[in-house]
C-alpha cells in the first residue's frame, strides 16, 4: 500500500484541452487528499523550439494548413508501427529521466500521447504504473503502447476500436473525458440570465469563436442572426481582443440582440442557458456540451481528431456538422426553429455523457495502487463576475 503517493501528470500545450484535463485530474487528486501532484509539459520543457514550431503548425491547421494536418494525422497512423515509433518514443527522454530521478513518482498519467515513459519501462525494466487518459472521441495509434497499464476512454466505441487493434479489453475503462467540476454542478438559471443580461423568453445562440480563427466571418454571421426575431446571440471571443472590439460596435447598435464577451472563466453558465452552440469539435468542449445537454453545430472540423469527433457526434444525432461557410446561417436558423430536433439532440447528448469522469479515473487509479482516498468536500462556487 502506498500511503502518500506522488503523482506525475504529463501533458502538452497543443490547444487547451490536454492541459485542462491534466489540471482537472490534479484538482481531483487533491480533493481526495493526494497532495503531491505534479503537472509537467514534457515536450515543451524538453524541446522548446520544436514545440513552438509544431504548436504554430497545429494552430495553422484551423486556417491554411488543413491538408497538411490531414496528411500528418492519417499518414502517421498508417506508418506509425514501422517508422515513427522508435523516434517518437525517445522524444523528451532526457528530460523525463531527470524528472523521474528528481521526483520519484509512484504513478504516471499521460493526458497527451507521450510514450516516453512506457518505452523507458520497456527498455530499463523500471516498475511504475502508467495510465493514458485519451482526450478525444477517437483513438490514434500513437496513444498505444504495451507498457501502458490502463487506458481511460470517452466511449464504448473507442474501446471497441482499441480492442480491434490489439489492446486487451481489461486494460480499457470507459469513463468519459475529464471536465471541470463546474459543469456538473446544479445552478439556478435565473441567476445566469441576470448576470449576463439575457432574456429568458428568447432563444439563445452561443458562438464560441476562440482566438485561433476557428470561425470565419463572425461579424457577418452576427449581423445575419441579429435579424432573427426572438433570438439573442452570445459571442465568446476568448483572448481574441481584436474580434471582441470589432463586435462591440454591433452590440452597441442592438444590445438586446447581441452580447459580446472576451474570456469567460465560468463558461458553463452560458452553456446552461443556450439553445444551441456553434463551436469547434474538440474533445473537451464536446464532453462539456454533453454534460449540460447542449446541441452543437460543429463548424468545418479540421481533418484528424476533430473530424473524427464531429462524425461521432453527428452519427449519434447530437450535432449538426457544417463544412461550407454558405450553410452556417441557414442550417443554424433551421435548427433553432425546430424544437423537436433540439430536444432529440439534447437526448443524444445525454446518452453520450458519462457522469463524474475525473472521479471515476482517480478512484480507479487510487484503488489499483491501494490508496485510500480522503475526500475533502468542495463548496459550490458563487457566480462571480468572471468575464471580460
Curated annotation (Swiss-Prot):
Main location: membrane
UniProt enzyme class: transferase
This protein's GO CC annotations: plasma membrane
Lineage: superkingdom: Bacteria
Enzyme Commission designation: 2.4.1.315
GO molecular function, one term: 1,2-diacylglycerol 3-glucosyltransferase activity
Record CDD domains: GT28_Beta-DGS-like
Record pathway: Glycolipid metabolism; diglucosyl-diacylglycerol biosynthesis
Transmembrane annotation, as ranges: none
Protein localization: Cell membrane
GO process annotations (BP): enterobacterial common antigen biosynthetic process; glycolipid biosynthetic process; lipoteichoic acid biosynthetic process
Reactions catalysed: a 1,2-diacyl-3-O-(beta-D-glucopyranosyl)-sn-glycerol + UDP-alpha-D-glucose = a 1,2-diacyl-3-O-(beta-D-Glc-(1->6)-beta-D-Glc)-sn-glycerol + UDP + H(+); a 1,2-diacyl-3-O-(beta-D-Glc-(1->6)-beta-D-Glc)-sn-glycerol + UDP-alpha-D-glucose = a 1,2-diacyl-3-O-(beta-D-Glc-(1->6)-beta-D-Glc-(1->6)-beta-D-Glc)-sn-glycerol + UDP + H(+); a 1,2-diacyl-sn-glycerol + UDP-alpha-D-glucose = a 1,2-diacyl-3-O-(beta-D-glucopyranosyl)-sn-glycerol + UDP + H(+)
InterPro entries the record matches: Diacylglyc_glucosyltr_N (IPR009695), Glyco_trans_28_C (IPR007235), Glycosyltransf_28_UgtP (IPR050519), Pro_diacylglycrl_glcsylTrfase (IPR023589)
Keywords: Carbohydrate metabolism, Cell membrane, Glycosyltransferase, Lipid biosynthesis, Lipid metabolism, Membrane, Transferase
One Pfam entry name: MGDG_synth
Summary of the function given for this chain in its UniProt record: Processive glucosyltransferase involved in the biosynthesis of both the bilayer- and non-bilayer-forming membrane glucolipids. Is able to successively transfer up to three glucosyl residues to diacylglycerol (DAG), thereby catalyzing the formation of beta-monoglucosyl-DAG (3-O-(beta-D-glucopyranosyl)-1,2-diacyl-sn-glycerol), beta-diglucosyl-DAG (3-O-(beta-D-glucopyranosyl-beta-(1->6)-D-glucopyranosyl)-1,2-diacyl-sn-glycerol) and beta-triglucosyl-DAG (3-O-(beta-D-glucopyranosyl-beta-(1->6)-D-glucopyranosyl-beta-(1->6)-D-glucopyranosyl)-1,2-diacyl-sn-glycerol).
Record family assignment: Belongs to the glycosyltransferase 28 family. UgtP subfamily.
Protein name: Processive diacylglycerol beta-glucosyltransferase
Organism whose genome encodes this protein: Bacillus cereus (strain ATCC 10987 / NRS 248)
Gene name of this polypeptide: ugtP
